[in-house]
Structures are given as C-alpha cells and as structure tokens.
C-alpha cells in the first residue's frame, strides 16, 4: 500500500508538470470533440471463455501513421502509445500517448492510469492531456493558434453479470481549459488578449453494457449511455466563437454491434450521438466529419464555424475475409445534426442562420457517403489499410464559395494507414 501511495504521488506530479509545461487546445480551432469521448472497442460475437492464464506483457504499445489529419493542421498524423502493465503487481496500467501532425499543426500528449479498486471488477482511471495547435494554414488572416489541457477521472463498477449480458455504471468528471489567440478578431481588430480563454467542467453518469445474441446468427453489442451536466466559464473571453457561458447538459450514446453472418462475412455497425438539453459551448458540440464519422468530409464538418448542439452518426460496414490476412469492406456513413438547441423559439434564434461565411440555411440537415476499404495484415500485429470514400448528395452546410469546412471541395477521398502493435 505504501508503494502504491508513492506511485500515485509520482503520477500526480507528472500530471501537474504536463499541464504546466505542455498546453493543448481548441476553442474554435481544430476539432477535439472526440478527445472527451473514449471510443468503445469492437465487440466480440461470442462471450469470452475462461482459459489458462498467460503471463502479462509488461510493456505493450502501438504506432500508427495515417492521413486522417486536416488541411489546417496537416493531413499526415502519427500516433505512438506505450503501456506499462502490472508493474506494481496490482493489475494497474500506465499509458503514455502522443499524436503529432505534419507541419507542426498539432501536438497532443496524454498520460493515463487505470487501477482495480478492490470491489469486484471495479476500476478507477485517470487521464491528463494537453494539445497545442496552429491553424494558420487554413486561415492565414486570423492566424489562429491555441492550447488546451484537461484532466479527468472515471470510476466504473459492474452490477450485473451473466453469460449474455453485462451491465456496469460509471461516474466521471473532467475539467478542461481552452485558450486561443488570433491576429485579428471577428470585427477585424487586434484583440490584444486571447480571443478565447475559458474553462469547462463536466460530470457524467453512465450506463455501460455488452451483450451477445443470436437474432440472426451470432452477434455482440457494446454500448454506453451518459447524462452530462457541466459549466462553461468564459468570463475572460474577448472574441469567442464557441458558444454560451453558464451551465449546460446533454445526453450522449455510443453503440457498436458486430454481426457474424458467415465464417467469412461480418456486418459491423457503429452509432454515436448526442442530444443537447441546453445550448452548448464549442468544446461540447457535435460534428459530422472525420475518419470515424462521415469519412469523406473533413474534421469539424457540420454546422458551420461552431458545429452543432445535437446530432448522430451511424456507420455500416459489410466485411469479407478474402484470405486469412486480407479483409475487404464496403461502407455507408450517415450523419445528421441540429445546429441550435430550441431553434426557432425566438427572433434571435431565427436570425442566426445563415452563419456568416456559410450557406447554412437549415438548422437540421444530414451528410452521407459510401465507399470501399481494404485491410492487409502483412505479419502478426502489422497492418496496412486504405479506403476510398465518395460523397453522396450536397453539403447544406458548405461555405459561401461552395467548399467544405477546410476550404476543399473534393467528391472522392482516398486514405491510407499503417499500424504496428508490439
């Protein structure tokens, strides 16, 4: 216990130094909405069977390079993560993760720790992160640069277990700060102080579940539903594009389902969405673009400059194993947003569209695409992947020059990626 206490003190010291020395950020810069959303894993189609325990690898890691970045911060993105497992023999994991984009557009660093806490199956996790960005490539006039940091804690406790259904509840809290500087403000004058300087605090109450069924053949489903309540303090903001100050609340949901059709074919469905109970700040809003959303669109696409209060994205992937090491898939992505909560309830709300610089005349609209992908496992733990995405229909939220959020207007997109696990 004394050793564990020393480790926690050491970890807290690292967290503090990280926040002090390396900031990371947004405001209305590059999208980091998903930073606050820990993605759900791909579910297995059958319950795990207890096997003979195997030794825990003390150090594991991942290296990923792809072109899922953005025009504003650099398309090429690299991720490296290292985990130290069970080094105190308490079942704990310490993780270090860094993400960097080409052109020094974005630098992100995250430290995390996860511990069992004595109650059967319960875990306590901490994360601290920081990001620094420069989006001058996209908007040289404003030359926006910024930084943000966050720290969060998450407690999860199982309360129901069976062969086909497992339920857990979770309580978490996050505190994040955002600072953005611009060479000029919206009105065209020099701000003199940070255009955005705000603090967000949020608490979440969540229900986690995973289940197995044979509705069609054999399938597994994982999910999470959360109620969030928080406060946004933007008292020091001079020229914020991000949204209202004060308390806010919303409901979010994530569901992943993997349906085993045959020994070679799977249907993989992913859903995530949120419903705003109050108007939201930019850091809590929802967007439709990016590699894990409607893939043909850029990060932060949807809703103009501020993104949207409510929305959802659903992805369908039909997978087929061509050989033992090669998987092909066809996909369809659909996303829908509502930019303003309670839009139309006031004269002020009705005059909020179109958003300056955008042809966004609809408060609610959708984006969609389809495409093909290929994944090749060249050797154990080494994968190459590529996908082609094609835009379906028009973008109702495009800019006045008919380009997307990142000022491009492509109808087709090809992406490549490389992943090495060790």
Report each predicted region and the residues it spans.
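Residue-level signature of outer-membrane beta-barrel architecture
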Residues: 84-86, 115-117, 157-159, 207-213, ...
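Outer-membrane beta-barrel initiation region
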Residues: 22-125, 161
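Repeated loop/turn-to-beta-strand initiation elements of outer-membrane beta-barrel proteins
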Residues: 59-61, 87-94, 118-126, 161-167, ...
């Amino acid at each position: 216990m004394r050793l564990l206490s020393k480790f926690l003190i050491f970890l807290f010291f690292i967290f503090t130094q990280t926040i002090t020395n390396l900031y990371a950020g947004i405001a209305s810069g590059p999208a980091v909405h998903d930073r606050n959303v820990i993605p759900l894993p791909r579910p297995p189609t059958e319950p795990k069977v207890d096997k003979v325990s195997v030794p825990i690898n003390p150090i594991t890691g991942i290296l990923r390079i792809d072109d899922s970045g953005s025009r504003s911060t650099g398309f090429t993105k690299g991720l490296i993560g290292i985990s130290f497992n069970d080094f105190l023999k308490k079942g704990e994991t310490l993780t270090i993760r860094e993400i960097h984009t080409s052109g020094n557009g974005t630098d992100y660093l995250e430290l995390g720790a996860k511990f069992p806490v004595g109650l059967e199956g319960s875990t306590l996790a901490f994360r601290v992160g920081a990001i620094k960005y420069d989006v001058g490539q996209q908007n040289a006039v404003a030359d926006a640069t910024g930084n943000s940091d966050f720290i969060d804690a998450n407690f999860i406790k199982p309360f129901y277990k069976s062969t086909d259904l497992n339920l857990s509840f979770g309580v978490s809290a996050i505190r994040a700060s955002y600072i953005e500087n611009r060479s000029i403000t919206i009105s065209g004058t020099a701000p003199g102080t940070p255009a955005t300087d705000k603090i967000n605090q949020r608490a979440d109450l969540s229900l986690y579940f995973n289940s197995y069924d044979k509705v069609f053949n054999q399938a597994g489903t994982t999910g999470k539903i959360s109620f969030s309540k928080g406060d946004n303090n933007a008292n020091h903001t001079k020229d914020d594009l991000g949204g209202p100050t004060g308390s806010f609340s919303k409901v979010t949901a994530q569901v992943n389902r993997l349906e085993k059709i045959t020994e070679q074919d799977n249907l993989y469905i992913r859903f995530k969405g949120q419903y705003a109970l109050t108007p939201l700040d930019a850091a809590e809003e929802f967007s439709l673009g990016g590699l894990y959303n409607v893939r043909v669109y850029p990060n932060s696409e949807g809703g103009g400059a501020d993104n949207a209060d409510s929305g959802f994205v659903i992805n369908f992937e039909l997978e087929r194993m061509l050989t033992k090491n090669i998987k092909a898939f066809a996909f369809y992505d659909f996303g829908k947003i509502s930019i303003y909560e309670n839009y139309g309830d006031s004269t002020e709300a009705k005059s909020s569209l179109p958003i300056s610089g955008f042809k966004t005349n609809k408060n609610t609209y959708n984006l969609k695409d389809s495409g093909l992908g290929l994944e090749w496992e060249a050797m154990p733990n080494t994968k190459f992947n590529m996908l082609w995405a094609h835009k379906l229909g028009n973008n109702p939220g495009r800019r006045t020059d008919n380009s997307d959020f990142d000022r491009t207007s492509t109808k087709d997109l090809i992406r490549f990626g490389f992943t090495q696990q060790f």
